[in-house]
Amino acid sequence: MKDMVTLGTTGITVNKNGFGALPIQRISQEDAVHLARKAYKAGIRFFDTARAYTDSEVKLGEAFDGIRSEVYIATKTAAQNAEDFWKDLHTSLRNLRTEYIDLYQFHNPAFCPKPGDGSGLYEAALEAKEKGMIRHIGLTNHRLTVAKEAIESGLYETLQFPFSYISGE
């Protein structure tokens, strides 16, 4: 387990090298599917995408059709309310050709979604988790204050945060 990492408190253990699928929106369907499958054959099991990454989910869905249970897929929603959360989740499930998403993340929200905050986002995520549509709830953010709040809340199983030596935070 030398090059393995456990994702937050999910219990998911994968190779520390994951596949960030934002760039595959810039290449053809055929090339993207080939690249994702090649990464899988090379031992990559964690694939990260988002609704905002145009057709990235569709390309991963095709790439892993038939081997879905052998990979971990994370995707994200930028929804600001429960109604849009459900729309995004159903679209992601259809695009990814799956009945569940391993890690569903709030994508860089301006605030930390919490129960009772009026947005309904966290409640929707919990309901989706109870229904088996998502397995784990995470948050991605570029704001240190929101990231700290997410950690301190204890509500999130993962936090995806960019680190940079040249950042002021």
Model-based region annotation:
Residues 56-65, 85-97, 114-122, 143-155:
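Distinct, well-ordered alpha-helical segments
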Residues 18-30, 74-84, 110-112:
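Active-site mouth loops of central-metabolism enzymes
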Residues 1-71:
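N-terminal binding-site loop/beta-alpha segment at the start of enzyme catalytic domains
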Residues 22, 50-52, 76-80, 106-109, ...:
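Active-site beta-loop-alpha junctions enriched in small/polar residues
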Residues 58-76, 123-132:
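Alpha-helix-loop-beta-strand connector modules within alpha/beta enzyme cores
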